[in-house]
């Protein structure tokens, strides 16, 4: 459960992402594909090379979903319901992959926002991404 301090940290950190969300989302996806090659199996129709328009497009979708989650941090299950349905029923993404992408997002944010990425912010973002992952996998049951 996110504390009020966690919510403040997440909103402040995500606010610093600004217009770079799509770029950071794409970078996190590239990190995931390189570090965890089995995740590529969910994107057989994508050009997964560095700078690919498809990876950039999906990175923007990831960032937009996280922006939505930040904006609705007190009601993420409702805000992410359609996305949860999509990943559970149509795409059938293995839930472990959300943890892998979350890790890669944390690394990407730490690399781009070193001054803002304090231990407290790191912990808050980790809890937030774990909450998002929980919501996205809730329809698997």
From Swiss-Prot:
Where are residues bearing N6-acetyllysine located in the sequence?
16
Q: Which CDD domains match?
A: Hb-alpha-like (cd08927)
- Which Gene Ontology terms cover its molecular function? haptoglobin binding; heme binding; iron ion binding; organic acid binding; oxygen binding; oxygen carrier activity; peroxidase activity
- Tissue-by-tissue expression: Red blood cells.
Q: Which SUPFAM superfamilies match?
A: Globin-like
Q: Which residues carry this modification: Phosphoserine?
A: 3, 35, 49, 102, 124, 131, 138
Which residues of this UniProt protein bind heme b?
87
| Quaternary structure and partners | Heterotetramer of two alpha chains and two beta chains.
Instruction: Spell out the PANTHER family in the cross-references.
Output: HEMOGLOBIN FAMILY MEMBER, HEMOGLOBIN SUBUNIT ALPHA
Protein name from the UniProt record: Hemoglobin subunit alpha
Species, as recorded? Semnopithecus entellus (Northern plains gray langur)
Native organism taxonomy = Eukaryota, Metazoa, Chordata, Craniata, Vertebrata
